[in-house]
Curated annotation (Swiss-Prot):
An annotated GO cellular component: cytoplasm
Sequence similarity: Belongs to the UreD family.
HAMAP family (UniProt xref): UreD (MF_01384)
Cytoplasm recorded as keyword: yes
One GO MF term: nickel cation binding
Protein's name according to its UniProt entry: Urease accessory protein UreD
UniProt source species: Ruegeria pomeroyi (strain ATCC 700808 / DSM 15171 / DSS-3)
Alphabetically ordered keywords of this record: Chaperone, Cytoplasm, Nickel insertion
Amino acid sequence: MELTTKLVGTCSALDRLYQSGSAKCLFPRNSRAGLEAVLLNTAGGVTGGDRLSFSAQVRAGTRLSVTTQACERAYRAQPGETGQVRNHLSVATGARMNWLPQETILYDGSSLDRRLSVEIEPGASLLMVEPLVFGRIEMGESLNDARFCDRIEITRRGRPIFLDATRLQGGIAAHLAKPFIANGAGAMALLVYLAENAEAVLPRLRQMLPECAGASLIGEDLLVMRVLAADSFLLRQSLLPALRLLNNNEIPRCWTI
């Protein structure tokens, strides 16, 4: 799927959309936060051999918020097969990009390789979150044999300003149970906020975080937050106030349904 924004007067609008396969996109009309795009995977999830990609160009002066209609699911994969997800965002000067997908749920036996790359110009801003849930906790599922590889790269003027990589393989539940890894957490999230007011909002953000979360300023305009939680419900209790603080008290409606 490929998506490009444009300015119509003072409003952000859709300029170009290309979609194929199981990837579909909806555009709610009641959004006050510029153009909102809701991604759907009509296949219901990702399994071994799947190839999904999304690309967005957020042009100068426009505002785009991207979310998902529901949680993405990484299903059990056949041996030797891996599902691939590739997302690429390009944010021009004066533009704002909100990358706010709902949780990705890893099933036991799943194999997922995911990449997110963001090219951001000076004067642009970004709010992104990637929530992750380790198994169907309410069903008693434990990740005894799964594979998850994730890489996030944010560049400005061709230079990396944020790189993050996660690699979990095999007995993920046993690994996360270690006290100095995740102490048995069933969910986690990474949040990145790149904006001129990043330093100013950091004290307020820290005040609302639980003990199993932390936020730091790693650049003059770059804030990073990480959260661990027992399950997705508690994870959202930490994420939603943070998203409201960093996004003018707005979150996508899909997050509240």
